[in-house]
Each structure stands twice: as C-alpha cells, then as structure tokens.
C-alpha cells in the first residue's frame, strides 16, 4: 500500500512538472475566476473520492451546474486563445495537474484534508451561485493554477505596440 501511494505521488509530481504554467500569457479577471472555479471543482472532486463525500459533490454539481458550465466554457476559450490548436490538450493537462495536486494534498495529510473538505462542502453548499467565484478565490489552494492576472500596465503596453509599417507598392 505504501509503495502504491509513493508511486502515485511520484507520478503526480512528474505530471505537474511537465504541465508547466497554466497559461503562456496573463489572464483577465474573468479567466482567473474560471481557473479558480476549476481548482475548487478539482479539490471537491478529489475530496469526494478520497473522503467518501460523493453525495456532497453531487449536490455541488447540481446546485452550481450553470456556473460550472459557464466558467468551463470561459476556460476552454482562454486556452484556445492562448494556445490555438493546442488549446484542448493544454486544457486537459491543466485539469489533470489540478487533480494531481489536490490528490497530493489529500495523501500528504488525510487526517486534515477530509475534515477541511467537509467544512468546504458545508460552506460551498450554503453559498448562493453568484457568490461561488468569490468563495473559490478565498481558498488557500486557489492560486495553484499559477496564472498571472493582467495588470493595467501590461494591457497598456500591449495596446501601444504598433504593427510595422508596410511600404506602399509603386506603380
């Protein structure tokens, strides 16, 4: 059993290292919210499987289906913009990395992970749907996506870059 756990942790660590940063570019606020929502969803999914909280996860998925779908589409769109044809595989690697990291947290200290997960399910299931992104952002694990939010300065710099001038063709 111990060797099996060690193998899982080693595999998860390698997978998370290979996945690299979540995005090659900075993300806007709505994309960051979508990433935080996906991190929360992954954490709760691992909690459901690890801690026997499938009923709570199903209640979460039913209650927040609309928000999860909306943020999922936003996340898919962000990865398509950032990576073009590689958007889907990069998104899949990102989601896998999040699940692996949540699994690592559960394995590292299950005695703490499961009670915290129960508290988190309680908070989430008592949260109005519109407030779920704020709850997701407040979690200590929400920054595990490693995405950097665009600042006004970055946005200003990007908009001030001009395309190179082209010479007019002479007739």
Tell where the protein language model's regions lie, with residue ranges.
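N-terminal signal peptide c-region/cleavage motif recognized by signal peptidases
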Residues: 19-21
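Bacterial N-terminal signal peptides that target proteins for export
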Residues: 1-10
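Hydrophobic helical h-region of N-terminal Sec-dependent signal peptides
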Residues: 12-17
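N-terminal secretory-pathway/extracellular module detecting exported/lumenal segments
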Residues: 2-3, 23-36, 89-92, 144, ...
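Immediate post-signal-peptide N-terminus of mature secreted/exported proteins
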Residues: 25-59
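Compact alpha-helical subdomains of small soluble proteins
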Residues: 64-170
């Amino acid at each position: 059993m111990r060797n099996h756990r060690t193998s899982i942790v080693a595999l998860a660590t390698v997978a998370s290292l290979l996945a690299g940063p979540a995005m090659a570019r900075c993300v806007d606020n709505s994309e960051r919210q979508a990433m935080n929502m996906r991190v929360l969803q992954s954490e709760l999914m691992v909690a459901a499987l690890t801690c026997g909280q499938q009923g709570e996860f199903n209640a979460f998925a039913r209650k927040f289906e609309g928000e999860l779908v909306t943020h999922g589409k936003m996340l898919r769109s962000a990865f398509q913009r950032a990576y073009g044809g590689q958007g889907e595989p990069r998104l899949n690697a990102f989601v896998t990395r999040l699940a692996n990291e949540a699994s690592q947290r559960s394995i590292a200290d299950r005695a703490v992970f499961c009670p915290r997960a129960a508290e988190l399910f309680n908070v989430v299931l008592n949260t109005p749907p519109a407030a779920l992104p704020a709850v997701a952002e407040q979690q200590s694990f929400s920054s595990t996506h490693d995405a950097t939010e665009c600042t006004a300065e970055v946005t200003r710099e990007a908009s001030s870059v001009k395309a190179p001038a082209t010479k007019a063709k002479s007739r």
